[in-house]
Each structure stands twice: as C-alpha cells, then as structure tokens.
C-alpha cells in the first residue's frame, strides 16, 4: 500500500483540476451557452450560480484560494439540490440531482483536504498542503 501513496497527491491534484474545469464548463454553458448553444435569459439566482460555477471552478482547478472556492462551490451545489431537485423527491436518482450531490461532496472533500502540492496555493505558500500535514 505504501508504494501507491506516492501517487496519491499527484492524482488528487489531477482530480481537483478536472472537477474544477468541469464545474467551470457548467457555468460557462449556463451563462454564455458555450456548449449547448442556449442563450436564453436566466433568473437572477441562476445567473449568480453560473458565475459562481465559472469563478470557483477555475479557482479550484488551478488551486488558487482552493479551500474558499471549494467551500462556496459545495454550498452552491447543496442549495441547488434543495431548491431545484429536492422538491421533486429526496432521492437524487429520482429527482435528477445526482450531479449536484456528487459535486457538493467532492468540493467539500477538496475544502477539507486543501489544494495539494500541484497548485498555485502551494507554489506561493498559501496554506499547508495535504502532503505537508501527513509527514
């Protein structure tokens, strides 16, 4: 098991990068219709959510202000689940809220674990990385 531990932080950073970019893509599509081509007017709360997704997604992806951005993103997904999906039932598979739940918990994990060693936060010495706290 110890032989695999050396890969844990690099793969955590890769996961953080991919999740952040995917989240930012959701926001870009919501605001600008980047991928689906939709450009309809959004209610103000959805517009705010789209901007949170773009900003927090890129911050998490590149590991800048990681804990703050991940906490905000996790909270946004909790709000999205309870405002949009939960009225249709509390089971995520039934109410189509699986992605909101997964994002909520992944971002909360990133908030708890921190940026990792492959991040701008680690490069500028902001906060302690998970590798530094486990050694």
Residue ranges of each PLM-predicted region?
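Extended, low-polarity transmembrane helix blocks
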Residues: 1-32, 38, 46-51, 55, ...
